[in-house]
Design a protein with these regions (language model features):
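Catalytic core of carbohydrate-active enzymes
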Residues: 429
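Catalytic-domain carbohydrate-binding cleft regions of carbohydrate-active enzymes
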Residues: 1-378, 385, 397, 405-415, ...
């Protein structure tokens, strides 16, 4: 049995910038919706990310009811991620927000695909099974980074805390059947694919991922599948979604499966592109700064001291961060125009984070008596340390002492003194020549 999964792998930005790829995306999704509505046998997996459909609906907002109807019939599989992020160059919190946003959007379409699909990330962090389990997922699907010790198509992947998910190894990649329909005799090509993959699958149906980067299914897909099944009896081809295969084809008990704990970062079977770690380092620095401002400053300070929850601003900041976390975005392996766009989005996230944090600081400072000084600790633990203050004091003060709220005097040291400006004048342009 060949379980054929029509899909595409959609890099939102990579060797071309986002808007140029979106031109092709709209054509692809238009065709998928038309074909799914015309024939209930047609199904399609949207690459494990909701961003594809969000980008599409910005151009075709009237198509959302069509998408919801096809998700309800099981013909379209959407989510659970918002973006297929790199897992090592962003923080754990960014990965959490990515999954949270993706599940939320997919459920508004009808339901999120029940598989943590990670087809093209450049290796996988050790905590991914833990994250998936916390979000209610028991299954994952991966390609890059799987070590040679895994000799079956399915294995149990565990995080350091013991959380585990049943994981489908995409043998041969997310496009192992991408060229199937380019051969003169597709039935023979299908048999060769089966023979090549059977060592990993044994008696289980073979998972054939029919799709690759920015690709669409051939127009005669259903007819060709029918012809293969009619012409020969050696094997059958069944169309389905990825979730349909992973959830409906148990391969023994979990105890019988190969086990792996920790990160998946082997290059034994696929290139994990380690060079992206040091490509366009400025993007990595900007990302870390924006993450720190949102997660460590803006949100905690707003929760503790803010007078109103700035939900839309925080949501926008995280949206810009997640949009920048794509495995061809934050990695810096795309075109120069892509890097420029990523830098702008990260800058917006940092602006929102710093602005919200400073707004809280201003609110706190406004609550203290006139002449007092407010010192705000942004850390999630008590701190003692040096505080650098700029104070305005009378010229005849020889020393300055600070009294704490409990009456104790704080040790102080004056590091410098500058005279206050006592006169200023605005010079009209016509007087500049006189100076």
């Amino acid at each position: 049995m060949l379980h054929l999964v029509p899909h595409t792998h959609w890099d939102r930005e990579w060797y071309e910038p986002f808007q140029r790829f979106r031109l092709r995306l709209v054509d692809l999704v238009d065709g998928v919706l038309d074909r799914a509505e015309a024939d209930p046998r047609f199904c399609f997996t949207f690459d494990g990310q909701t961003a594809m459909l969000e980008d599409y609906l910005e151009i075709r907002p009237e198509a959302e009811p069509r998408i919801k109807a096809l998700v309800a019939t099981g013909q379209l599989a959407v989510g659970p991620w918002r973006i297929l992020s790199d897992e090592f160059l962003v923080s754990g919190e960014t990965l959490v927000r990515n999954l949270e946003a993706g599940v939320d959007r997919a459920e508004r379409f009808g339901q999120a695909m029940a598989v943590g699909y990670l087809p093209d990330e450049f290796g996988h962090a050790a905590q991914v099974p833990q994250l998936l389990r916390l979000a209610g997922f028991g299954h994952a699907a991966v390609w890059r980074g799987v070590p040679a010790a895994i000799d079956r198509h399915r294995f149990t992947w565990s995080a350091p805390d013991g959380s585990s998910v049943r994981t489908e190894y995409l043998v041969g990649g997310y496009g192992n059947a991408a060229g199937l329909f380019t051969y003169p005799d597709v039935a023979v090509a299908g048999r060769r694919l089966l023979e090549r993959l059977e060592p990993y699958f044994g008696s289980d149906p073979v998972l054939a991922m029919y799709g690759t980067d920015h690709s669409s299914p051939v127009p005669a897909l259903l007819e060709v599948v029918e012809e293969i099944n009619r012409r020969q009896d050696g094997y059958r081809v069944r169309l389905g979604t990825l979730a349909g295969y992973v959830l409906d084809e148990p391969s023994g008990d979990g105890d019988d499966l190969p086990r792996w704990q920790g990160e998946l970062r082997s290059s034994a079977r696929a290139n994990i592109l380690m060079g992206v770690i040091s490509a366009r380092v400025g993007l990595k620095v900007a990302c870390a700064r924006a993450e720190r401002l949102l997660a460590r400053y803006a949100e905690p300070l707003q929760a503790l001291h803010g007078t109103g929850w700035p939900g839309p601003f925080l949501e926008l900041g995280w949206r810009r961060l997640v949009e920048s976390s794509g495995h061809d975005s934050i990695t810096g392996c795309g075109a120069d125009a892509v890097a420029d766009h990523v830098a702008v989005r990260l800058g917006e996230a940092a602006q929102l984070g710093s602005g919200l944090a400073e707004r809280v600081a201003a609110e706190v400072a406004g609550r203290v008596p006139l002449g007092a000084v407010a010192v705000l600790n942004p850390s999630p633990f008590p701190r003692a340390g040096l505080v650098d203050l700029d104070l305005t004091v009378p010229d005849d003060w020889d020393e300055v002492a600070l009294e704490l709220a409990d009456g104790r005097l704080a040790a102080t040291q004056e590091t410098g003194r500058s005279p206050a400006i006592v006169h200023s004048e605005t010079l009209p342009g016509r007087r500049l020549g006189e100076l």
